[in-house]
Amino acid sequence: MLPRLFLTILPVCSPSISNKTSKKFRDAHANHVFLFEMDLNNTLSFFGKQLKLDTEEEISKVIDQIRKHLNLEVLDFRGNTLSVLAGKLIAESLKTRRELKECIWSDMFTGRLKDEIPLVLDALGEALTASGCRLTTLDLSDNAFGAGLSTSLYNFLQSPALYSLENLILNNNGLGLAGKTVGKALCSLIDASKKAGTPLKLKKFVCGRNRLEVESTIALSDAFIKLGTLEEIRLPQNGIRDDGIIALAEAFRMNKKLRIIDINDNFCCPEGAIQISEVLSDLQFIEVLDLGDCVCDDPGVLAIIAELDKINRDCLKKVVLSGNNITSDVIDEIGACFNSPKMCHVKVDISVNMFGKDFDSAKARHGKGNIDFGRRGDDELLSSDEEEEQGAEDASMEEDAFNTSRETVIDRSNLHEASADEMMNDLMNKGFGCMKIEDNQQNSNGNGMVSFLDKSLKLDTAESAEPVVKVIAAASSMKALELRGNTLGIAAGNVIAKALESHPELERCLWSDLFTGRLKNEIPPILEALGKAMMTAGCKIKELDLSDNAFGPIGADALKDLLESPSSFSLEVLKLNNNGLGIGGKQIAKSLTECLRKSIAVGGENRLRLKTFIAGRNRLENPGAHALAATFKALETVEWFDVRQNGIHEEGIRALVAALKHNRNLRYLWLEDNTVLPKGAKALAKTLESWPKLEVLNLSDCLIRDAGCNYIIDHLNPQHHRHLKNVYLCGNELTPPVAKLLIQKWSKFDGLTPKPVLHIHTNSFGDEFSDVAGMAPENVNVGDEDDDLGSLDGDQEEYNSKSSDSEDADLDDDDEDDDEEAEIQIIDNGESQLKLAMDRIDRLDIDFESRFQEDTARVILQLSAPLKSCKMSEPALQRAIEVAENIVRRVESVKRNPIPATTQLVNNIVAQCAGTGVKAETDWGYGADPQVISRLFSELVARGHFKLELALLQRFFPSQ
């Protein structure tokens, strides 16, 4: 009688019955209605519940629901994380579920160790076999299997429960060479299913973003050929080349019922496209052909469209040819094909190609409803008329209703980033410590930002940090924590770290200028505590800014555990500007390399994809450069790289350039104020073609001279570097004849909109400055004549050659100062001596846009030697005062609390001057004359500076 009861209940539960009547019936027959609804609903979903199944209590709640479900055909575990215990207990509960048909088990192991996953996979595979179920759909996407899980994955794919499989989705598993295992497993499964009398008839296979490359693709193709039943093959973003494409083409031919082919973002090249075109006539049911970003070029595209005419055109719905270097030479053939009456129903994507100046006319002729040219600004030969959105999705990856399913959508969402112009302004005006990547939500605590920016908090004890801890604890969601402009002690750091443990959602740590006035040995324990807290919480950090914290090499050691932990696998922005790293740069590089290794081992989306690396003013020198080179060669993902003012010589520069060659998305490269020299510039110039997205190149103050500047301009190509915005060649001893030549060559960029700007101010134009400036168009910046360094005479050229070209030259400030002293002593002529002193003072003032703290003190201390050598000549003194005042104004613009930046400047100078009675922790070796420094301070005080430090100055530098 139970079935009759169900029939009686059905009309009562119908949506057409009023809510009041339905509720009354439910109240009267609650048990029967519950049973009936569970029977109709064949799906049990835990999707997005973010369950962390560790304890038996948590696991039992899930198991109870599995056991109570009367007709469990679909089990959806997406977005939860299973421990080994959970996997085994859930597997046990599935052994009786013979009716199970679909297992949606993607994103099921977040935060689990790689040796835990195979144990769960083994248990679940055994359970499916024991249950006797016959699955039609298996989705294991977004689980970081990697190559290390080959055995367990192979065994799982041998289960008789998969003989009936129709849909297999293995998207974003980090398979790599484990793709060969999947191919072999499928071949074995095909053979076993045939022997069992139920041959496998797989219809859909999805395996995107898995680094399959050639070997794994060939293995999978062998399985596809044996199958012959596939209707949908999706293998986007797998680095497939040459032989892999050829193998796939043959596999396509053997699967006559193919409807969807998606090999977006692989390397077909013209040869591969031609191979694919030759099999299209065998595929009469094809609906979607996605060859976006496959570098097919004109010949490959022409071959494809020629063969499309031979298929069943009524079936064809969409063709994606975006990002294939298609030129206007073939646009008429493409238009004629897809605008024809028999093909005008087909949606065609040809955006992000190379139509250039013909874009508008081509679109006018052929851009009818079915052909999508995309935005004009997306064309590879044009520049957008409006600011391009950072991280915009490639049009070729857009999904629509007929080719999208919940199993196959590939998420390409990116974090919002600030416009490049805003970041550039911060860089040039405030220095890196003031630079922030904006977030539209950052001012709202409800949207994830907790900020104590410039609150001038002096947090020494746990009690003093209590207000901060309370705010952190009260935040329901804290994705960003900004502590810049405060000072943190050990006790306060520990309690704040403890508060972080309750915020696993933390992504952005904006912690620059956090240790003002602290001792060096205080900083590492705080860094370690904060890092440990984030690791304990399971944070996935995307941005870490520790700039302007003078922690030195010991700070780099303190960051080791954090940078090598899973919490840093997600790191996209790392800013370590002005930290005094020195040899600690090698440790940072080593930690990033280890982080990359571990993340790759875990697999999938866990791979470290660092985009921004800023480590200017850290005295990295050549050893640090070589260490970083090894790291960034392996990373391949950096977009913003800055190591300005690090004393890196030509050899180190060449190593960095060779490494960055592998980072094809590089947009910003800052090597300013290192010793690149012409040879280094030549090596860099030859690498420029590797960076088609380059926007800013800064080689100011790099001593690359005429030859180096010429190399750079010659190798910048308007056809290739379409995104270029600024090139800085300032302060490189560029002479007028070569400057005029470069201005002429720069006109090759006149076709770009907007035109990129070439900066060549602060060079050696001398009396010909007006001539050079007169030649310069609006997109060439020669600066003001007052900034020009004047003509190079023979003696100066020789001096610069000796001090800069020698492969053994040591750029340490101490040695450089000694060399210059020696050079001054051999000059007898008073006028020459004054000229050289003035030149040295001018050089200290070159492009002083972002130096502060120790750097500012170093420059003022270095003013002592040239002033003393010319016996404080009035012209030299006035010029030195101008330089010093420029520095002080910069320092005054930097707001620091509780100790003002100007006070820090005075403290550093006092400690480095003999006779003050203050002993420096480290002697910088300038030997500054206290009388000269005293005179400078007197003049600066007279001009209204150092009001807060007046008593300090009177004590250590009494007026002369």
Curated annotation (Swiss-Prot):
One of its GO terms (molecular function) is small GTPase binding. SUPFAM superfamilies: RNI-like. Transmembrane segments: none annotated. One of its GO terms (cellular component) is nucleus. InterPro entries: Leu-rich_rpt, LRR_dom_sf, RanGap. It is found in: Nucleus. The keyword Oxidoreductase does not apply. The keyword Cell cycle applies. Gene3D superfamilies: Ribonuclease Inhibitor. Keywords: Cell cycle, Cell division, GTPase activation, Leucine-rich repeat, Mitosis, Nucleus, Repeat. Residues 370-408, 777-819 are annotated as: Disordered. GO terms for biological process: cell division; embryo development ending in birth or egg hatching; nuclear export. It holds the Pfam family LRR_6. GTPase system comprising ran-1, ran-2 and ran-3 is essential in nucleocytoplasmic trafficking. Ran-2 is a GTPase activator for the nuclear RAS-related regulatory protein Ran, converting it to the putatively inactive GDP-bound state. Required for correct chromosome alignment and segregation on the metaphase plate. This is Ran GTPase-activating protein 2. The lineage of its organism: Eukaryota, Metazoa, Ecdysozoa, Nematoda, Chromadorea. The gene is ran-2.
